[in-house]
Amino acid sequence: MISSNDFRTGTTIELDGQVWRVVEFLHVKPGKGSAFVRTKLKSVQSGNVVEKTFRAGEQVQQAILEKSNLQHTYVESGDYVFMDMTSFEETSLTSEQIGKGAKYLKEGMEVNVIFHNGKVLEVELPISITLKVTETDPGVKGDTASGGTKPAILETGAQVMVPLFISVGEMIRVDTRNDSYLGREN
């Protein structure tokens, strides 16, 4: 159990059968009446955000999460197989469990997988990864002045918008949180 007074950004709690992460919190002490804690909670499973108010000192069940460092080894019949880097056990995850980050997975990539009561809650990819451009329109000389972008398909099949000067075969850095181009990789 954790007191609402001990809430911090990133704290995970169990509420109404779901696991929630505290995104924002504010301790309020009104001039009249008792103190309370106003929070913004994000569901770890669905991503929904709700605002909830707790009485000061209210006890809430804290969610115990386990974080494992796993390495993506191969894909078997649509499932992604990962190996635990410490125990060498294999774990198979579906693309639904991985989420939108599945399009960036390549063999040998290490990810953090968060478990709650033995169930996968979240797969955390590295914030930026380096991938090879396999398909894009050729750049035309003089196009760079406008600052435009064009679609490019990467080695994993993911599609991102890149500047016009990027060509096939180049290695680029991509932000996995918002699918944006970060720069060339030397």
Curated annotation (Swiss-Prot):
Gene3D superfamilies: 2.30.30.30, Nucleic acid-binding proteins (2.40.50.140). PROSITE patterns: EFP (PS01275). Keywords: Cytoplasm, Elongation factor, Protein biosynthesis. One of its GO terms (molecular function) is translation elongation factor activity. The keyword Protein biosynthesis applies. InterPro entries: Elong-fact-P_C, NA-bd_OB-fold, Rib_uL2_dom2, Transl_elong_fac_P/YeiP, Transl_elong_KOW-like, Transl_elong_P/YeiP_cen, Transl_elong_P/YeiP_CS, Transl_elongation_fac_P. It holds the Pfam family Elong-fact-P_C. One of its GO terms (biological process) is peptide biosynthetic process. GO terms for cellular component: cytoplasm. Belongs to the elongation factor P family. This is Elongation factor P. The gene is efp.
